[in-house]
From Swiss-Prot:
Its job: Binds to actin and affects the structure of the cytoskeleton. At high concentrations, profilin prevents the polymerization of actin, whereas it enhances it at low concentrations. By binding to PIP2, it inhibits the formation of IP3 and DG.
Signal peptide per UniProt: none
GO cellular component: cell cortex; cytoskeleton
Family under the similarity heading: Belongs to the profilin family.
PANTHER family noted in UniProt: PROFILIN, PROFILIN LP04
Name of this chain's protein: Profilin-1
Gene from which this protein is expressed: PRO1
Location(s) in or outside the cell: Cytoplasm, Cytoskeleton
Statement: the UniProt record of this protein carries the keyword Cytoplasm: yes
The entry's keywords: Actin-binding, Cytoplasm, Cytoskeleton
Biological source species: Hordeum vulgare
Record text on subunit structure and interactions: Occurs in many kinds of cells as a complex with monomeric actin in a 1:1 ratio.
Length: 131
């Protein structure tokens, strides 16, 4: 299965009639493995900040999580494994696996719980597959 299939069929799939606005799979080095067409252009330092928060949970809490110039307020996740952010009616979920980061961005009417489910389910599957 190609990485594009994971984004198209597993991240951008429909859940209760809703779907993510954009999604991507990145290496821990910030390189894009695959992304949806509308995934925001991000800066290397934004990914570096995300990786640092996985290594040092709470690092992003004072400043917020930035991706593509958009600032998300960091909300409770799973230290070292999942980072969740909120901005207005939308947000972001990032799951760290052994090799890639799985990122999902949503907006209403999708809920944070639906985004978490989609992103974390794929991340758990990839961990089981050795990624």
């Amino acid at each position: 299965m190609s990485w594009q299939t994971y984004v198209d069929d597993h991240l951008c799939c429909e859940i209760d009639g809703q779907h993510l606005t954009s999604a991507a799979i990145l290496g821990h080095d910030g390189r894009v493995w695959v992304q949806s067409p509308n995934f925001p252009q991000f800066k290397p330092e934004e990914i570096a900040g995300i990786i640092k928060d996985f290594d040092e949970p709470g690092h992003l809490a004072p400043t917020g999580l930035f991706l593509g110039g958009t600032k998300y307020m960091v909300i409770q996740g799973e230290p070292g494994v999942v980072i969740r952010g909120k901005k207005g009616t939308g947000g972001i979920t990032i799951k760290k696996t052994g090799m890639p980061l799985i990122l999902g961005i949503y907006d209403e009417p999708m809920t944070p719980g639906q985004c978490n489910l989609v992103v974390e389910r794929l991340g758990d599957y990839l961990v089981e597959q050795g990624f």
